[in-house]
Amino acid sequence: MKSITFNKQTKKAGILCMGTGVCRVCKVLYKYTMYNKNTYRREGMFEDKNWDAIFKKRLARHYDEMKWLYSELYHNDQQAFNYFCEMMYDYYEKRSPLLKEWDEAREASPDWYKGNDMLGMLMYTNCFAGNLKGVKKHLDYIQECGVNYLHLMPLLESPKDRSDGGYAVSDFRKVQPELGTMDDLAALADDCHTRGMCVCLDFVMNHTSEDHEWAKRAKAGEKEYQDRFFFYDDWTIPSEFEKTVPQVFPQTAPGNFSWCEEAGKVVMTTFWPYQWDLNYANPVVFNDMTADMLNLCNHGVDIIRLDATPYIWKEIGTPCRNLPQVHTLVRLMHMASEVVCPGTLLLGEVVMEPSKVVPYFGTIDKPECHMLYNVTTMASTWHTVATHDVRLLRHQMEAVFALPHQYTFLNYLRCHDDIGWGLDYEYLKQFGISEVPHKKYLNDYLRGLAFGSDARGELYNDDPRLGDARLCGTTASLCGIEAAEYEKNSWKLDRGIGLDIMLHAFLLTQSGIPVLYAGDEIGQLNDYTYHEDPIKAEDSRYLHRGDMNWDNAALRNVEGTRENRIFKALRQLEEIRAEYSVFESEADTWIIEPWNDHILAIGRYYNGEKLLAFFNFSENEQTAWVNEYEDYYDLLTGERKAAKAITMPGYSFLWLMTTFNKPFVKKQHPKLDRKPVENIVIEEVEPAKKPAAKKTTTRKAAAKKPAAKKAAEAKEPAAKKAAAKKPAAKKTTTRKTAAKKAAEVKETPVEAPAAAAPVEAPAPAAPAAPAETPKAE
């Protein structure tokens, strides 16, 4: 042990030295105690605790930063911090041996969730299968969809008549009785783990229901519990807040405060009047909410979706969005999960423009959220569907491609929520597009009110005063499939299915984790029955929150049905994505210029594989004016195809691939129906350097890797093997290493590929319309 001078007054004040060994205030050295080999700890902190060695090691890794951030946020409240540490150990001890083994496996393979084999599915438990036991019974179907990431929408206890779809939680320790119990949740998670699937659950951290125990005691006048919310005796301070805080629901729930009759005070309610904002400036709130999160992790939840993340810190005179303290809180929660349950990931819900989304990843050294939603790309995609003009989407993808490979986005077409038009209007100004009339055009088109549109959506939270509204509807209905079936128009049905499949192909081309909204795999349509329910009628989001139609799901096996055509096509695309390393997150990605504003063209390169992906957002035939000199093969059919002046049918796509330093081998997918392609000869491609493709923005891996990284990569197969070992023959979801994939290619003989059953493109019976120009509002 190395003893040096220590300032007792500084220690009493809780001031930290941030690991330098010198107090930044009094410049006096701290006293250190040797711990293990190279780790030092301040004497009297936690090394004397009778805690598990693994927990101590993990806590030691984060202790200095954790205490510094906590003390800065909570004014050196040592008692609250000590409670926080004790609470973390309590949940570490309660964690099952099985989950602890999962933690160790995932620590050995920290990028386990970044593989190109990851596919998510988002669902409401009651809509999909009635309850948690019902979901468990349908795991075979979920697995048949290729899903290994199951996201269950809010299922914790909430008042039936004031639940906001489960986002008004009255008890974070109980499941809604009609959905099951916490034991049912743990059993479902255990079954998912056995199948190599992970479970995601929403954690509503910004607010509670007014029926929560804390809220009830606050209503009763208990000051301690009123301090966990934002209570004010009159409207003076709330009025000051209102000057700078935007309204979330200006039409249906105006303002950010509500009068609480029982308490005789004003309370902050950013969302709905029955959802009370939590005061995270109170350390008791942070400690107890973190404990609630860790409790969910101990019931087998692998991914915690942090709902309404940007809103959780409030300060008068600010917008109460994206404040620096929010990032401190998320960073502390990230470290807490790494100490207690390092197999758990944080998914941030940040529904804002890209410049405000990306900071929630944190930094490489100090990460915050492991994953974030790619909200802007989703909205830009539907903008492109309505305008048939890819320029905004191309601009958006360039911004995404410029980000580091370490950032993992969840990509999706539709989800439980509405489509908000938070587009880059500064960029659109150069094309003469103004925000308000453009939003009206988008909403009109996707409701079928514009000329040539067969989309069927509904407005949500319409604000005529501002000319603003958001949009609801399922993917299939927005693609025109609902209208085509209603009209019994087979030509329109082909076109709608073609658009639906093309959009999913674009989704699967992006780096990150693609997530399906349950029902989209069979083209489920809008559910208008919500209009008849007095509780749901005012919320048009229930239009796309209908019950899973299991009779229709059975039609996925009936050749020629809408369900069969979409299901089979998506499974084909998902299996191809999982097979080829070019879809890995580490791939270089760039935009290709096709000299046609109706076609989006994307390039990907990784591990000797180069992919060109083309997407025609026009309903008419279009040509991508490219001139690539390599030999390419269609990944869906195995046919050789030149990447020169490619003519594409309306609402179609192409995945063309070539390889360098190895022959192209068409992978087989036995689960899919295949038709043989005759007279195809696969020739070895001469080894060549990666060509300088035309691109505007590229995500480049470092040319030279540090020696430490190379050593880590050399050990990667062993790490993967360790990650795969788990009790009771349970299976983790890990990626193939590049070395393993290269070995598979080497061992596989070069042979002519069996052709895939091609994704069905529309075969118009009606004459094609004249070539279109970008639509004006």
What residues fall within each predicted segment?
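Active-site and adjacent substrate-binding regions of carbohydrate-active enzymes
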Residues: L29-D631, L635-K689, K704
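Positively charged N-terminal leader segments that act as targeting/secretion signals
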Residues: T5-K27, K31
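Intrinsically disordered, low-complexity regions enriched in Ser/Pro/Gly/Gln/His and often acidic
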Residues: K12, L16-G19, G44, M648, ...
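Intrinsically disordered, low-complexity, compositionally biased regions/tails
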Residues: M18, C23-V28, A642, A755, ...
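Intrinsically disordered, polybasic Lys/Arg-rich low-complexity tracts
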Residues: R674, E678-E777
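Compositionally biased, intrinsically disordered low-complexity segments enriched
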Residues: T10-K11, Y32-M34, V199, A718, ...
